[in-house]
């Protein structure tokens, strides 16, 4: 939403009453009665599901799902481990209002831990997504010489450096 310019985390606001109704389903905030009036930075800080649903709606399903794809969700990372799963992402043609809402705050998808780490790493390193590796290199135990090594493998850009900087600030603010 930041990359697309549909929200300013510090200027745009949201009122959290404690829940939002989406397609007849009530999506609640973890805080009974809600958080009240907050900036979208505060929405992230407080992990407010209704506020993130609003962000998902501002972005729209096509753009949200294009970013899921861009960050590698729904496909294998190519990590050097056997049995990697691609996770589970709704097909775009089956995404309605409720699927958009739950996907926006992370409960409408199933991702692997390595996909999550790879995506968060891209967010905080300037937007560059790299192929993950378990081992950087193998060394011969007696001489300590490199037997095999893996170079950093750039995959693609995901977000701008400016958005990355804003997200680093937001993620630090969450902590």
Go through the PLM ranges and name each one.
Residues 2-175:
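Beta-lactam-recognizing serine transpeptidase/beta-lactamase-like catalytic domain environment
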């Amino acid at each position: 939403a930041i990359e697309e310019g549909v929200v300013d985390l510090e200027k745009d606001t949201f009122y959290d009453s404690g829940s939002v109704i989406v397609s007849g389903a009530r999506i609640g905030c973890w805080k009974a009665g809600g958080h009240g009036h907050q900036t979208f930075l505060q929405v992230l800080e407080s992990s407010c599901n209704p506020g993130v649903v609003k962000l998902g709606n501002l972005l729209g399903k096509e753009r949200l799902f294009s970013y899921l794809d861009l960050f590698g969700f729904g496909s294998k990372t190519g990590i050097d481990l056997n049995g990697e799963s691609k996770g589970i992402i709704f097909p775009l043609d089956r995404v309605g209002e409720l699927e958009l809402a739950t996907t926006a705050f992370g409960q409408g998808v199933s991702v692997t831990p390595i996909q999550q780490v790879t995506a968060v790493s891209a967010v905080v390193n300037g937007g560059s997504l790299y192929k993950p590796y378990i081992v950087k290199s193998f060394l011969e135990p007696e001489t300590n010489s490199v037997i095999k090594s893996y170079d950093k493998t750039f995959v693609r850009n995901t977000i701008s450096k400016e958005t990355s900087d804003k997200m680093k600030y937001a993620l630090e603010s969450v902590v």
